[in-house]
Regions:
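Conserved Rossmann-fold NAD(P)-dependent oxidoreductase catalytic core, especially the SDR/UDP-sugar
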Residues: 7, 12, 30-32, 36, ...
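Active-site-lining helix/loop region of Rossmann-like oxidoreductase modules
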Residues: 154-157, 161-215
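NAD(P)H-binding glycine-rich loop region in Rossmannoid oxidoreductase-like domains
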Residues: 5, 31-100, 186-187
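Conserved SDR Rossmann-fold cofactor-binding beta-strand/turn motif
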Residues: 33, 148-153
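Active-site beta-alpha turn of Rossmann-fold NAD(P)-dependent dehydrogenases/reductases
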Residues: 72, 107-110, 150, 199
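Short acidic/polar active-site loop segments enriched in Thr and Asp
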Residues: 27, 66, 104
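N-terminal Rossmann NAD(P)H-binding glycine-rich loop of SDR-like oxidoreductase domains
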Residues: 1-27
């Protein structure tokens, strides 16, 4: 059983990731929490939590961790300073901590549009921050996967997706399906050292990831 640290565990997508991991036979989740009062929520789920702030020191959060899922984010609608602090610099801190701890894989939740943030003026600063974090991970020396979904919805997941390194189209995908993409990206050698965009589609998540991995 591999121990997985989840940053952003209290967020809408992160909670779904925790639930999937908690029902898995292969993974044991550890939720990264910012406030002590958040611990009870995970204790009720019989999930362990570790206190750590992405705007502070996170090196202690890697003890016993095999792999990491970064699903944290300011949401794109917070102030620019918060976006930079969490989505960019917070991600970098966790990447550094993971590298120092010799973590085996780092799975990043990113976003479509990071290849050219200037194309989306409303989210340009957010996408620039995500791009900075993505590039930092690519150059970190860690094994990684970067998942770049389209617009996230709270619809029930259909477990059917469309993925490619570049999809050349816009669209939506449920948080449920994104959470499964993040968890399935933990498996080796699936999507190792790859970035891919994701939308709702016609293929099962597993077959889509196997196909893009060229296995």
């Amino acid at each position: 059983m591999e121990n997985i640290l989840i940053a952003g565990a209290t967020g809408a997508t992160g909670k779904r990731v925790i639930e999937i991991l908690n029902n898995s036979q292969a993974f044991s989740p550890l939720a990264l929490i910012r406030d002590e009062e958040q611990r009870q929520m995970f204790e009720d789920m019989e999930v362990e939590a570790v206190l750590g702030d992405l705007e502070g020191d996170v090196s202690h959060t890697m003890k016993g961790i095999d792999k990491v899922i970064f699903a944290a984010g300011s949401g794109g609608k917070t102030g620019k300073e918060k976006t930079t602090a969490v989505d960019q610099e917070g991600a970098k801190k966790l990447i550094d901590a993971a590298k120092n701890a010799r973590v085996k894989k780092f799975v990043m939740l990113s976003s479509m549009g990071t290849d050219d943030p200037s194309q989306n003026k409303d989210l340009e600063h957010y996408l620039k921050a995500k791009k900075e974090a993505d590039d930092y991970l690519r150059n970190s020396g860690l094994d990684f996967t970067i998942v770049q979904p389209g617009a996230l919805t709270d619809d029930m997941g259909l477990a059917k997706v469309k993925v490619a390194e570049k999809l050349n189209e816009k669209g939506e995908i449920s948080r449920d399906d994104v959470a499964f993409l993040l968890v399935m990206s933990l498996a080796d050698p699936l999507v190792k050292n790859m970035s891919f965009e994701a939308l709702e589609g016609e293929k099962s998540i597993k077959s889509a990831l196997i196909e893009i991995s060229d296995l």
